[in-house]
């Protein structure tokens, strides 16, 4: 089963992306993606 999660930028805390995640994984998702407000690639973490 997969569930929808929201990713937020670590620098500006803006919620830019949403993605799907497997429910069996316990750790939070961390992906390097482009942030429109920072105008650069930053680490995006899964929010609650």
UniProtKB/Swiss-Prot annotation:
Pfam families: Ribosomal_L33 (PF00471). GO terms for molecular function: structural constituent of ribosome. GO terms for biological process: translation. SUPFAM superfamilies: Zn-binding ribosomal proteins. Gene3D superfamilies: Ribosomal protein L33. Keywords: Ribonucleoprotein, Ribosomal protein. The keyword Ribonucleoprotein applies. It comes from the Bacteria. One of its GO terms (cellular component) is ribonucleoprotein complex. Belongs to the bacterial ribosomal protein bL33 family. This is Large ribosomal subunit protein bL33A. It comes from Bacillus mycoides (strain KBAB4). The gene is rpmG1.
